A protein has these predicted regions:
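Short, small-residue-biased leader/transition segments that mark boundaries at the very start
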Residues: 1-5
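Short alpha-helical segment of the dimerization/phosphotransfer core of two-component systems
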Residues: 38-46
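Disordered, acidic interdomain junction associated with two-component signaling
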Residues: 45, 156, 210-242
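Helix-loop junction within the histidine kinase core
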Residues: 54-65
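A conserved beta-strand-to-alpha-helix junction within the catalytic ATP-binding
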Residues: 64-79, 239
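Short conserved segment of the HATPase_c
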Residues: 153-167
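Glycine-rich ATP-binding loops of the HATPase_c
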Residues: 194-200
Length: 244
């Protein structure tokens, strides 16, 4: 019910904003309306994130774990983020692999998307890299990581990163402002999936966010037996002409 109520409120606010847009005349009014629209979008995002946190904490949503090809996630990430990285002059590289992992496809996508979004938000120049490492301590696990050349995160700030409304302490060079809720959602998802999270960072030297996930064998493709289809034949009369 809470989710439906919030959706109705958001829809009503959007209708109000659209009605205003059709009636404004001056450029100043249009700027005010644009600010209102951005505020509405921010409020919707915050409410949605808070509801997600409440649902995760309340156990009303659970991960749907299954074998999942990591290649699908990595290729989608490259398509999703390469354009914005190019616009900002940031090198964006995704190192593809062919592992299958035990995960919830939607959850793992949201987790890594959050890491990449944060990296692009705070990196002014340089590169953002998505890659995979084998875990030295756990041979049947891999680490999916996002490296950036951003401003880095101080140790005292890293401790609080996964709390609600906490940010890295830096201002985005691109004018973006996060809600401070994305990593809080990541923390709850990784906890329910039993994925360790690792953060490596030093001020002025960039950051790396990693999660450790179990690998599984690729599902075997079972060939379907081919059924013989009887040929339908007709009787034909053969006429032979002798021209001798």
């Amino acid at each position: 019910p809470t989710r439906r109520s919030s959706d109705l409120l958001s829809y009503a606010a959007r209708l109000f904003s659209t009605a205003l847009e059709q009636s404004v005349q001056s450029e100043e009014d249009r700027k005010i309306l644009q600010q209102l629209d951005r505020s509405l979008h921010g409020a919707e995002s915050m409410l949605s994130a808070l509801l997600d946190i409440a649902r995760l904490e309340g156990g009303t949503i659970q991960p749907n774990r299954q074998p999942y090809p990591l290649h699908d996630l990595l290729s989608d990430l490259e398509l999703q983020f390469k354009s914005i990285a190019a616009q900002r002059g940031i090198q964006f590289k995704v190192h593809d692999v062919q592992f299958w992992i035990d995960t919830d496809p939607q959850w793992i996508r949201r987790i890594i998307q959050n890491f990449v979004s944060n990296a692009l938000r705070y990196t002014a120049k340089g590169r953002v890299i998505v890659g995979v490492l084998r875990s030295a301590e756990r041979p049947q696990h891999i680490r999916i990581g996002v490296w950036d050349t951003g401003p880095g995160i101080a140790e005292e700030q890293r401790i609080k990163l996964f709390q609600e409304f906490e940010r890295c302490g830096h201002t985005s060079p691109w004018g973006e402002q996060g809600l401070g809720l994305g990593l809080a959602i990541v923390q709850r998802m990784t906890s329910m999936l039993d994925y360790p999270v690792h953060v490596y960072s030093n001020l002025g030297q960039g950051s790396c966010f990693m999660i450790e996930v179990p690998i599984v064998p690729a599902p075997k493709v079972v060939a379907q037996p081919v059924q013989a289809v009887p040929l339908k034949t007709k009787a034909y009369k053969i006429l032979c002409l002798d021209n001798d």
